[in-house]
């Protein structure tokens, strides 16, 4: 199972960045390999925002859709994502947002495994490259908001 972390410093307010990450419907506009997204459910509670969403990812001929449970904890400004359906055997990623003087530090941790062993082996080899491309895309788009 590939595991990795990326930390970026982005010159934006923490809450703007949190809202940006939670705007899942816009992911296909700027995230590499993200073809489509659909939010099925969004509930705003006192302590958290809970979202159920699909992301369609890939590059032909390998395209698939997975369903995620996304939880934003308002108390500690974290977003926790887990897989609840699709081609992934396991997915867990976490976002942490820390406001600094002139920027927000954003930490993204990801851990996943694909059910198909052949695809998992391919993805593992290009995982860090893909993760950096996605982190770059998030940062570039976030700096425009």
Give residue ranges: language-model regions.
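Short Pro/Gly-enriched beta-strand edge/turn motifs at strand-loop
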Residues: 20-23, 49-53, 75-81
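Amphipathic alpha-helical protein-protein interaction surfaces
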Residues: 23-26, 62, 102, 123, ...
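Hydrophobic pocket/interface hotspot
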Residues: 17-20, 27, 53, 70, ...
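Hydrophobic-ligand binding "helix-grip"
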Residues: 28-29, 36, 41-43, 56-103, ...
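A short small-residue
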Residues: 1-5, 111-118
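Structural detector for hydrophobic anchor residues on beta-strands
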Residues: 2-6, 51, 66, 91
